[in-house]
From Swiss-Prot:
A matching Pfam family: Metalloenzyme
Species classification: Bacteria, Bacillati, Mycoplasmatota, Mycoplasmoidales, Metamycoplasmataceae
Taxonomic source organism: Mesomycoplasma hyopneumoniae (strain 7448) (Mycoplasma hyopneumoniae)
Binding site for substrate: 122, 152-153, 184, 190, 258-261, 331
NCBIfam families referenced in this protein's UniProt entry, alphabetically: pgm_bpd_ind
HAMAP family listed in its UniProt record: GpmI
Cofactor note: Binds 2 manganese ions per subunit.
Gene: gpmI
Protein name: 2,3-bisphosphoglycerate-independent phosphoglycerate mutase
Pathway: Carbohydrate degradation; glycolysis; pyruvate from D-glyceraldehyde 3-phosphate: step 3/5
Quaternary structure annotation from Swiss-Prot or TrEMBL: Monomer.
InterPro entries, sorted: Alkaline_phosphatase_core_sf, BPG-indep_PGM_N, Metalloenzyme, PGAM_B_sf, Pgm_bpd_ind
Length: 505
């Protein structure tokens, strides 16, 4: 008889022994407590080299879901680009050179934009520093930087030392300037909040209510208003000539390598067919370089990604299983696009259900997010499927606020929903595996009681509802082979990692 299975991916829930600042350990979680005590479980590595990132680099949702679906370690953006820097191939990149030549030929400034931090989730400031040196050595005369404050994958107010480093570098180049600053809340939205994105976009054009002549002074001004890096109000540098802000035919390099939060701003600049929203102040440029491919955005791509040709969902579909993908808006792309290898696959016998995320200023005020509605939908339609991949977003998204009490509440709400799923699975003859894509909620306050808003390097869980099996520890790349093994299906030869189900000798 064909087994029916749910793969529950909890976003941003790692395992950490210390209870201080630990939104998981401090929460009341009777369901998780019972699962850990009574059911097969093991530890899963979800960061650093184990998921294709640099050593010590915290995991993230994109990389986590890619590895879960691939069955092998997927080397992504930061690792590919860092390797190009190490080998020197970065400084031979034809797409960058094309943008440089266009700037030199036309006399228009090169516009470089992206998330400015060492967070390594969406971008890395070292890549920007390398681009500046590359452009200068190639002969680019004018260069404008449009920096997005992070405050999420790094500390909430951590940008100043890096701006000071950047200013020291820019002193070497007469017409290289920080032209605009905005928070990622504006310039990197992914929830179709185009009213926000347009404010970030307008700053690229030199149109903003806020202005500055010294970036550090502006950052201090924002801090005095209680505004952290993530939420910097878009502002422009009065020392930059109006005609030198982004305009028709200016070459652009977007140095974010992760696509999901780069697509909307890229769409406004290029006016693609990806979204209906059009900018109120359109410009036209044919020289737009993205660091990696942004799905749905037709532009020059500096670095090619690793290809996942035979992800878990494809093999499940080929085996004749009817499958469902279920998540709320914040993580919908992750249980579809990313878990399928970073491409939009149309799979036979496969449905997708999107539950709308709440449109709010802060998820700390709504720690439940859409967890209840997701569970409701599973209980309503789940029995119609053989294999389900679902995601709960609230430990990660609430953890990103750095609000420990709200994170504890988010975990407690999640625990109750997992309990509902356990009962449903038993009634409907479903099995389930629970894992997570990376850590976050388990470290929401540092040792000094300050908010910690970033992901972590702690391992995550793998729990099975089947008491007849035993699990060994592994990494996210072991998840797909484990699922296939459990369902009695062969893994694809591309999957070089093994099942974590311990076989009797």
């Amino acid at each position: 008889m064909k087994k029916k299975l749910v793969l529950i991916i909890i976003d941003g829930l790692g395992l950490r022994l210390e209870s201080q600042g630990n939104g998981f350990a401090l929460a009341k979680t009777p369901v998780f407590d019972r699962l850990f005590q009574e059911y097969p479980n093991s530890l899963i590595a979800a960061s650093g080299q184990e998921v294709g990132l640099p050593e010590g680099q915290m995991g993230n949702s994109e990389v986590g879901h890619l590895n879960i679906g691939a069955g092998f370690v997927v080397y992504t953006g930061i690792s590919i680009i860092n390797n190009a820097l190490k080998t020197g191939k970065f400084f031979e990149n034809e797409k960058f050179i094309l943008a440089f030549r266009h700037s030199i030929k036309t006399g228009f400034p090169l516009q470089i934009m992206g998330l400015f931090s060492p967070g390594g989730v969406h971008s890395h400031q070292d890549h920007l520093f390398a681009l500046i040196d590359f452009a200068a050595n190639f002969g680019v005369k004018k260069l404008n930087l449009h920096l997005f404050g992070d405050g999420r994958d790094v500390g909430p107010k951590s940008i100043k030392p890096w701006i000071k480093m950047l200013n020291l570098k820019l002193k070497n180049y007469e017409n290289y300037k920080i032209a605009s600053i905005s928070g990622r809340f504006y310039s990197m939205d992914r929830d179709k909040m185009f009213d926000r994105v347009e404010l970030g976009y307008n700053a690229l054009l030199g149109k903003a209510e806020n202005t500055f002549t010294d970036p550090i002074d502006y950052i201090n001004f924002q801090y005095e208003k209680g505004v952290s890096d993530e939420f910097f109000e878009p502002a422009i540098n009065l020392k930059v000539n109006k005609k030198d802000f982004l305009a028709d035919d200016h070459p652009v390099i977007f140095f974010n390598f992760r696509p999901d939060r780069a697509r909307q701003l890229s769409h406004l600049i290029l006016q693609t067919d990806l979204y209906e929203q059009k900018p109120k102040n359109p410009i036209k440029t044919d020289v737009f370089v993205s660091m990696m491919k942004y799905e749905g955005i037709n532009c020059l791509v500096a670095f090619e990604e690793m290809r996942v040709e035979n992800p878990l969902g494809k093999l499940i579909s080929m085996a004749g299983f009817r499958q469902l993908r279920l998540a709320e808006t914040q993580k919908y792309a992750h249980v579809t696009f990313f878990v399928d290898g970073g491409v939009e696959l149309e799979l036979e016998n496969s449905d997708r259900i999107l539950i709308d995320s709440l449109k709010v200023q802060s998820y700390a005020d709504f720690p439940q997010m859409s967890a209840v509605e997701i569970t409701d939908k599973l209980l309503e339609v789940g029995q119609n499927y053989d294999f389900i991949i679902m995601n709960f977003a609230n430990p990660d998204m609430v953890g990103h606020t750095g609000d420990l009490k709200a994170t504890i509440k988010a975990v407690e709400i999640l625990d109750f929903q997992i309990g509902r799923i356990c009962k449903w699975a038993e009634e409907k003859n479903f099995d389930f595996f629970i894992t997570a894509d990376h850590g976050n909620a388990e470290l929401t306050e540092d040792e000094n009681g300050n908010p910690s808003t970033k992901h972590t390097t702690f391992p995550v869980m793998l729990i099975s509802s089947d008491k007849t099996i035993k699990l060994k520890s592994g990494k996210l790349a072991n998840i797909a082979p484990t699922i296939l093994d459990y369902l009695g299906l062969d893994k694809h030869p591309d999957m070089d990692h093994d099942s974590l189900i311990i076989k009797d000798k």
